[in-house]
């Protein structure tokens, strides 16, 4: 298994629609308009967060149950920024829509800009032949409110290509998150 370079990522996005919309260079903004970087990097792709957020609140239930999750536990926010309460979390989605090749596994890592502020990004691997918007989970590990910026970089995707194709892909299994659009809540 090997990690894929900027050239491979660019080719797969342009010729096979692996990432849409696709930014073929790393965008950092300018001195008077700084942004958290996004787009192609040397061995990955920095994704942006869309302006749709679901901020967790515990006013409706005392227990979080992934098999019976209460959608009322979230407050929907559409904004260029999202404020996450202390020791809480928010869900969002990527601006980008992904189509993962059959011989590729994609791993997501948080960006250091957020990690150094106590904001952790969690995303499970994007499996072979999965497609959709990526649902992002932001944990605010601090005792203060934390800010997330929409349409700026929030995490980096690393593409690992196997020496052989998998026998059964996510699409073949009929995965429950296949083709998801928007922020997607837990499914069982």
Swiss-Prot record:
It catalyses: dCTP + H2O + H(+) = dUTP + NH4(+). The active site is at residue 137. GO terms for biological process: dUMP biosynthetic process; dUTP biosynthetic process; nucleobase-containing small molecule interconversion. It holds the Pfam family DCD. DCTP binds at residues 111-116, 135-137, 156, 170, 180. Its EC number is 3.5.4.13. Pathway: Pyrimidine metabolism; dUMP biosynthesis; dUMP from dCTP (dUTP route): step 1/2. It comes from the Bacteria. It is an enzyme of class 3 (hydrolase). Belongs to the dCTP deaminase family. NCBIfam families: dCTP_deam. Catalyzes the deamination of dCTP to dUTP. This is dCTP deaminase.
């Amino acid at each position: 298994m090997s990690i894929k370079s900027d050239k491979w990522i660019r080719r797969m996005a342009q010729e096979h629609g692996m990432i849409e919309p696709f930014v073929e260079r790393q965008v950092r903004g300018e001195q008077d308009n700084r942004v958290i970087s996004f787009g192609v990097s040397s061995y990955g792709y920095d994704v942006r967060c869309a302006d749709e957020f679901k901020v967790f609140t515990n006013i409706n239930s005392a227990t979080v149950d992934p098999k019976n999750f209460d959608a009322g536990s979230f407050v929907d926010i559409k904004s260029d920024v999202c404020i996450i309460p202390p020791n809480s979390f928010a869900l969002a989605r990527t601006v980008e829509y992904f189509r993962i090749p059959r011989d590729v596994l994609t791993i997501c890592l948080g960006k250091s800009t957020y990690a150094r502020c106590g904001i952790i990004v969690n995303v499970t691997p994007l499996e072979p032949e999965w497609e959709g918007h990526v649902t992002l989970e932001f944990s605010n590990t601090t005792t203060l409110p934390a800010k997330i910026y929409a349409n700026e970089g929030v995490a980096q995707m690393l593409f690992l290509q196997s020496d052989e194709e998998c026998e059964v892909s996510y699409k073949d299994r009929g995965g429950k998150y296949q083709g998801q659009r928007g922020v997607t809540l837990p499914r069982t």
